[in-house]
Amino acid sequence: MTYTTIGLILAGFGLGGVGYSLLVRTLVLRLGEGGLAGVGGVLLLLGFGAIAAATDWIVIVPLVVSLGFSFYMLHNTLQTRATEMAPEARGSAVSLFAFCLFLGQAAGVSTVGVAIEWLGYRPVIGLTGVALIALAFWLRARLVHA
């Protein structure tokens, strides 16, 4: 597979994000914050699970778009909550959120790299979906009790 093809497939994640931005108002009204987190987590689990099981790259293309859409369902809920953590220090709260996001991405790349060497791609991709649904359900439970 060429790097151009890989880049085009990965661009689908951004396309999913754009789709989310076009539908966010309707989604928030219908699902609420807890629903966004829960549905986003379920879609992430299904998407990563399907990618882990996929045997042909063409199947992965719509799944990557779906991952972009569902990632932003979860991420946007977390980000919105970050702005409400400390209203008197909103800038600091959002900065802390961004710091944690980028630190998590850096640590995730290192951790996943080692995990792939030990376990292979498919189990690690599947476990990513499991970790994300756990995060989504934890957040959803916190939103329900807030």
Where are these regions (language model features)?
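A late C-terminal transmembrane helix in Major Facilitator Superfamily
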Residues: 84-119, 128
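Membrane-helix boundary and inter-helical linker elements of multi-pass secondary transporters
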Residues: 29-30, 52-53, 84, 116-122
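Helix-to-loop junctions at the C-terminal end of transmembrane segments
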Residues: 19-33, 116-117
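Juxtamembrane helix-start elements in MFS-like secondary transporters
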Residues: 2-10, 60, 90-94
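C-terminal transmembrane helical hairpin of 12-TM major facilitator-type secondary transporters
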Residues: 34-78
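Multi-pass alpha-helical transporter architecture, strongest
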Residues: 129-146
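Short hydrophobic/small-residue motifs within alpha-helical transmembrane segments
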Residues: 11-15, 102-103
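Intracellular helix-loop hinge segments at the cytoplasmic ends of transmembrane helices
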Residues: 72, 76-85, 98
